[in-house]
Amino acid sequence: MKSTIITSILFSVATVQAYSPAEQIDVQSHLLSDPTKVEGKTYDYVIAGGGLTGLTVASKLSENPKIKVLVIEKGFYESNDGPIIEDPNAYGEIFGTSVDQNYLTVPLINNRTGEIKSGLGLGGSTLINGDSWTRPDKVQIDSWEKVFGMEGWNWDNVFQYMQKAERSRPPTAAQIEAGHFYDPACHGTDGTVHAGPRDNGKPWSPLMRALMNTVSAFGVPVQKDFHCGHPRGVSMIPNNLHENQIRADAAREWLLPNYQRDNLQILTGQKVGKVLFNQTASGPKAVGVNFGTNKAVNFNVYAKQEVLLAAGSAISPLILEYSGIGIKSVLDKAGVKQLLELPVGLNMQDQTTTTVRSRANNAPGQGQAAYFANFTEVLGDHAAQGINLLDTKLDQWAEETVARGGFHNVTALKIQYENYRNWLLDEDVAFAELFFDTEGKINFDIWNLIPFTRGSVHILSSDPYLWQYANDPKFFMNELDLLGQAAATKLGRELSSAGEMKKYYAGETIPGDNLPQDATVEQWEDYVMMNFRPNWHAVSTCSMMSRELGGVVDATAKVYGTQGLRVIDGSIPPTQVSSHVMTVFYGMALRIAESVLEDYAKSA
């Protein structure tokens, strides 16, 4: 059976260049690699992690010359792999190098261990990701306030910060002709982070228009712009890069213009192990961090105002647990004395990815597009089955998830599930993304955007420098997640040779002969379980929501029950989003930086 869609058919842009050797040396000369240079010192703010959010917030705080900021980053600045980092067309070549942390999961479904790709170095995952630049659905961000009680976290507010972060570059006439549409009202033009069309100078592939014409013939909208609050349909997308096609990573955008500030120091090659606290009448107050490379070689540095955790969704919860903040049973097992009970490390929401690839005839040239497909487009003939699951299984799923250790409160988790049900059935929110790439092939990378599975990440020992933890996304422990991934992958195969695409289709290579052309969705489920990979978009391990619903941080990113401690990275969004996540994280970082500065002004 075929899917319904088939059967119903602060540098100016001109001057930005690749890093020069002289520039490399100058930046390196301003960075610190000797931990004794900061040992025992006091800064206003100590930031654990020099990735997207860490460097963004550090840049904003240090605009005030009176504020002293220290960033501690486990990795380094650039590397021997620098040219690969700078070229967004070399995506994937950087994996396995010195800037890829490559966390491993516990054994997953079918006893497969997953690799979690994550950037290591100043810039974090912006050094290695696909630099795709899209925004989520309005109702998703609105739910952060409406459902989870986070005042001020609504689309209209967050959209302003996403625009403030952006320095957008409109497409040229040739790019528009190829299918690169643009709505200037949905973009910022005066921000720090450069974004615009990816263009390697080759002709544009006719496959872009062929895909648009194929899906639009069956009622799928061709989107003018995926940044306006309802990314459903198909369009080409901008990327996080400069006009000369150099990657606009967070180090280039936020560090390079500011590394010479006297009040901003960056320490590399050191890992933050835990937060230091003083006990007060109002509860534990963060006063610094312990950092280093191993149990015998570590140091303390102090924060007069706040400690800000920006180590990412896999690591920030571990730092909290090593510091004594978390679930008592987890901390007891690891040998850590509990300081505060919070559901740290739970509610992990990552996505899964599969690929469909075919050869292409007479379709040379470049181009990337995305098809954000809604629930019925993805499930097709199985839509009624999916609706029935959402109407009858939420209670059961919540109970099973809590029993497996993905969350701690059945009632609160059901509220999350009801929110997702509303998105999918009532709000036309995209359920899956089919990311389309050409260059002599028809290639879809496909992921279910809205997972109901909840995983976890927890420490396994009391030594933060041993790197012992359990990263357990629990992929496909929910039947709708598996059905959705299978149906979306099946849809990718069908689209590859449907409509106008058919004249360019020259035979499938993935899955190819590994799966019959008339495979059922059940056969696709078996295939998916053996051939998926993590999508590396995990969020919510330190969820920003009301404490009653299972939150770890409040609407200002402050850790509940503490003073002087915030989590400011991708571990705090309470939901997944139907987009690539950089735009959300940048907007989030700017909003949090503003909140930190407001508190600083009050204290001063």
From Swiss-Prot:
Report how activity changes across the pH range.
Optimum pH is 6.2.
Gene3D superfamilies hit by this protein: FAD/NAD(P)-binding domain, Glucose Oxidase, domain 2, Glucose Oxidase, domain 3
Temperature-activity profile = Optimum temperature is 35 to 40 degrees Celsius.
Any one GO molecular-function label of the UniProt entry? beta-D-glucose oxidase activity
What role does it serve in industrial or biotechnological applications?
A: Glucose oxidase is interetsing for applications in glucose biosensor production, the disinfection of medical implants or in the food industry as an antimicrobial and/or preservative agent. Glucose oxidase is used in the food and beverage industry as a preservative and stabilizer as it is safe for human consumption. In bread industry, the addition of glucose oxidase induces positive effects with regard to loaf volume, bread shape, and texture, but had no effect on bread color, smoothness, elasticity, or mouth feel.
Look up the record and report any one GO term of the cellular component aspect: cytoplasm
Q: Binding positions for O2?
A: 558-559
Provide the cofactor list for this protein. FAD
* Compartments where found: Secreted; Secreted, Cell wall; Cytoplasm; Secreted, Extracellular space, Extracellular matrix
Identify the glycosylated residues.
111, 213, 278, 409, 531
Keyword Glycoprotein included in the entry's annotation: yes
> Binding residues for FAD, per the UniProt record?
52-53, 73, 125, 129-130, 132, 272, 570, 582
Q: What are the EC numbers?
A: 1.1.3.4
Xref: PROSITE patterns: GMC_OXRED_2
Q: Return the broad EC class.
A: oxidoreductase
- The positions flagged as active site in the entry are 537
* Signal peptide (UniProt feature, chain positions): 1-18
| Keywords attached to this entry | Cell wall, Cytoplasm, Disulfide bond, Extracellular matrix, FAD, Flavoprotein, Glycoprotein, Oxidoreductase, Secreted, Signal
What is its quaternary makeup? Homodimer.
State the family it belongs to: Belongs to the GMC oxidoreductase family.
Its biological purpose: Glucose oxidase catalyzes the oxidation of beta-D-glucose to D-glucono-delta-lactone and hydrogen peroxide in the presence of molecular oxygen. The enzyme also catalyzes the reaction with D-xylose but at a much lower rate. Shows any activities against D-fructose, D-galactose and D-arabinose. The enzyme is cytotoxic for a series of bacteria, yeasts and filamentous fungi and acts primarily via the liberation of H(2)O(2), which is a harmful oxidative stress-generating agent.
Q: What is the name attached to this protein's record?
A: Glucose oxidase
Which organism's genome codes for this protein? Penicillium chrysogenum (Penicillium notatum)
